[in-house]
């Protein structure tokens, strides 16, 4: 909606619940996500990577190891998933990102020949998993007071 109401340059951050079919130790059927978008002239994937590094380093410190993997999201092109190396030595996906698909821009009456954008979605529960060494994301929703009391 924000892209329909404003003209570039524009930037938005929003948060909310996301629903999907996944349910395992690293995926929930409902999770909380912070999303961001930035649209202006000449926005590049290099700018997106720089922003992601700044976000991750601000959350976990400069010593955290991360990697970008090619991925697919219909609203970004190209798309990537970003993984962080956990304390246990396993890679854990923490966010999805990419350059805004030109079709999305055009559908918002933004000239995709003049403007481009970047977007990302960051899972809040994943941040908590990594910061606190939690191995099963479902623990956050089991009502186990012994587990939950450590997060006061």
Language-model features: where?
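TRNA-recognition modules of translation machinery and tRNA-sensing kinases, especially anticodon-binding
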Residues: 1-152
